[in-house]
Swiss-Prot record:
The keyword rRNA processing applies. The gene is rnc. It is found in: Cytoplasm. One of its GO terms (biological process) is tRNA processing. Mg(2+) binds at E45, D118, E121. GO terms for molecular function: double-stranded RNA binding; metal ion binding; ribonuclease III activity; rRNA binding. Belongs to the ribonuclease III family. The protein in strain DMS 938 / 37b4 has 5 other sequence differences. In Rhodobacter species, 23S rRNA is further processed to 16S and 14S rRNA species in vivo, probably by RNase III. It comes from Rhodobacter capsulatus (Rhodopseudomonas capsulata). Signal peptide: none annotated. This is Ribonuclease 3.
Length: 228
């Protein structure tokens, strides 16, 4: 098939030229646009999740021969979770070539973590089908390289870490307060404050309450650890 200019540019950003571009087209087709004649990316997402998981598990296994299963598991989860896949997708501007139905397009689908993360997994599967596991694994390790290097920090759940900090000092668990909700329904922004019984507090804003709570906890924990 003839490759459109935007797909060709995306292949360059991805770092893989497809022998069978149809695999990539399917990987980028969301279910809101899929049909009997235009398969969507859900099956590829399923496959890509497994290719990503094996690639990452193997990389972590060999990277630290002394790490226990209990240490490896949170690192693995941090690297393969939907938010991380979505962040990698943004690194290569996957949203620009994501094929969406009108409703998803109008609701800001190109920016949604869920859609971007799913599509990133589907693209990994497309590379696997096009060129095999070794090529797909090499692509994953290249795109995730910086995150693999910093995975110990990413794997540390800020809310849990902040709660442990408070408990170690005889304080009750942190309290999270919703300060406001801004933006349209399809792209809300939540403002959350985390408050310790000792008076320390931080605020953060994100597209979901969970992410805003994590961001607020991380900001407060970093300030506490600096002794500020």
């Amino acid at each position: 098939m003839k490759v459109a200019a935007d797909l060709s540019a995306f292949m360059d950003r991805l770092g893989h030229r497809f022998t069978t571009p149809e695999h990539l087209v399917r990987a980028l087709t969301h279910s809101s646009l899929g049909s009997a004649t235009r398969p969507d990316n859900q099956r590829l997402e399923f496959l890509g999740d497994r290719v990503l998981g094996l690639s990452m598990a193997e990389a972590l296994f060999h990277a630290d021969g002394r790490a226990s299963e209990g240490q490896l598991a949170p690192r693995f989860n941090a690297l393969v979770r939907k938010e991380t896949c979505a962040a990698v997708a943004r690194d290569i501007d996957l949203g620009a070539v994501l094929k969406l139905g009108r409703s998803e397009m109008m609701s800001g689908g190109r920016r949604k973590d869920a859609l971007l993360g799913d599509a990133m997994e589907a693209v990994i599967a497309a590379v696997y089908l096009d060129a095999g596991f070794e090529v797909a694994r090499a692509l994953v390790l290249r795109l995730w390289a910086a995150r693999i290097q910093s995975v110990d920090n990413d794997a540390r759940d800020p809310k849990t870490a902040l709660q442990e900090w408070a408990q170690a000092r005889g304080l009750p668990p942190p309290r999270y307060e919703t300060l406001g909700r801004d933006g349209p329904d399809h792209a809300p922004q939540f403002r959350i404050a985390v408050v310790l019984a000792s008076g320390e507090t931080e605020e953060a804003q994100a597209g979901s309450k969970r992410n805003a709570e994590q961001a607020a906890a991380k900001a407060l924990l970093e300030r506490l650890e600096r002794g500020a």
